[in-house]
Amino acid sequence: MTPPPPAPESSTPGPVSDAVRGNWVDRLAPPWSRPYLRLSRADRPVGTWLLLIPCWWGLALAAATDGWRWADLWIALGCAAGAWLMRGAGCTWNDLTDRDFDAQVARTRSRPLPSGQVTPRQAAVWMAAQAGVAALVLVTFNGAAILLGIAALAPVAVYPFAKRFTWWPQVFLGIAFNWGALLAWAAHTGGLGWPPVLLYLSGIAWTLFYDTIYAHQDKEDDALIGVKSTARLFGAQTGRWLALFLVLTVLLMAAAILAALLPDASPVRLLLALCAPWALGWHLLWQLRRLDADDPATCLRLFRSNRDAGLVAALFLAAAACL
């Protein structure tokens, strides 16, 4: 693939303010590519993990119902590649639509578009390139998964605008970010049913939990420029709402597992799978007990910890599938 055109000479080459210092993009990527990789959030991989993990949940739970197959290894790898590419394309789209807002927020004004490192046209070309490669991965899956992958474009397209018209943009993020639970289930089974739908709803509740924490970083700037979020909506009641999302995450995931595995699964397989919501719930409780919604550094640290929480749940589901 021909690399995108170099960023304008007048662009600011510095890293994005909320990226980890010394990340691989800053250290290893060719200078011409850094603004594009920053657009894709390659310097902040936690978002890719949060997009990928529901895919692995869906695949592992599907495999636990009828046994894993060698083809599942490709589905898992294909989901990883697709998550990296589509998270990059989605973030590029988000930055294109939000560039005027981002220029007014301290945490985001150093991003490539508002800082002038990349032009809107260059960003659009980069977005199309990422989506095109992701499509090549998608077409290796079965027909049901391909249709679901195409349908996923709708919530991805709508999400950046949600903060303009609703106090619940995190719901739209959850709809988009957890779509992989449906897609990966369909890639294994060839269809859908109640178990993946319940798992999908569990993922949406999880997203409401972690992205409300994330949104507390920007609540003061968001109030000044009129951006809506659950962090602003909940205010001092954030802890109670997060507790509700925690309970919903655990109960819906447990319901998905029971719907998928009963009555045929062995007790050991069932108990091992149920360790997934149990472990995830304990981690979310740990986050809730340590949350200081007025400390951006704490909010960012807790948000990032959801990668580990989600992966532990995925490991329990994968172990149940391998029994």
What are these regions (language model features)?
Residues 52-97, 107, 131-135, 139, ...:
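Membrane-embedded alpha-helical segments that form the functional core of polytopic membrane enzymes
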Residues 29-34, 249-251, 255-323:
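Extended hydrophobic alpha-helices typical of membrane-associated regions
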Residues 49-59, 173-188, 233-236, 240, ...:
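Small-residue-rich segments of transmembrane alpha-helices in multi-pass membrane proteins
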Residues 76-83, 99-149, 224-273, 308, ...:
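Multi-pass membrane catalytic core of lipid/isoprenoid biosynthesis enzymes
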Residues 33, 37-38, 108-198, 283-292:
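Intramembrane alpha-helical segments
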Residues 60, 64, 139-141, 162, ...:
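Helix-loop junctions at the membrane-solvent interface of multi-pass transporters
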Residues 9-36, 91-118, 212-235, 288-298:
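Cytosolic, membrane-interface loops and tails of multi-pass inner-membrane proteins
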Residues 41-51:
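Membrane-interface helix starts
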